[in-house]
Amino acid sequence: MSPDISTDEVVYPETDGKPLAENSVQCRWITMIAGELFERYNKQPDVFVACDLFWYPVKGNPKIVTAPDALVVFGRPPGDRQSYKLWEENGVPPQVVFEVLSPSNTDEEFVAKLEFYERYGVEEYYVIDPETETCEAFVRDTPDGPLRTVRPAKLNGFVSPRLGVRFVTTDGLTLLTPDGRPFQTREDRVNGLLSQLAGSEAALQQERQRAEQEKQRAE
């Protein structure tokens, strides 16, 4: 890892002015993945989850930066951050990173990000193509080892060592939570909550009717 560069005043930008996604398909995948991770870890005191957050691994050099579509850091507290500065986080890098491809992504960008994540300590790196619903996975077998490719033949049923998320590739790409539930979009979660509320309201109405009938019989 490169040594920190000592400067008195360094500005670390919080945004590059670019949108989160280039199209609705990419946006849906990013928000689905980030939403599920937020939902799962939001009550854990030592897990930080972020979406499209600038990550600066080297103090004093803001040119070394990337913004994963979703990242998970174990061993760091949750909470709002303007960016993720490694030297302010006890040197703990994101262990898991997701990138969702856009039409403008190039092979050069792909290689550069893989090298970045390998150099700065990412343990698991998942690249999802939302158009073809395919995934490339890279994992680190040892702390000092390289990120190796998970062969496509072994990706179906592959389980993330850190997250416990299962990748299913038999019919497109499906991500399953550790309890076997497919990842849900925000709309799926909202509809699920509305359905639960409707069911609760119906049950409450039935209970009211039953109580009223018992009251009438007692009279």
What are these language model-derived features?
Residues 22, 27-40, 48:
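A structured, charge-rich N-terminal accessory region that forms the first stable segment of a protein
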Residues 1-22, 36-39, 55-68, 73-120, ...:
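C-terminal interaction segment
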Residues 43-55:
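A short acidic/basic microdomain associated with nuclease active sites
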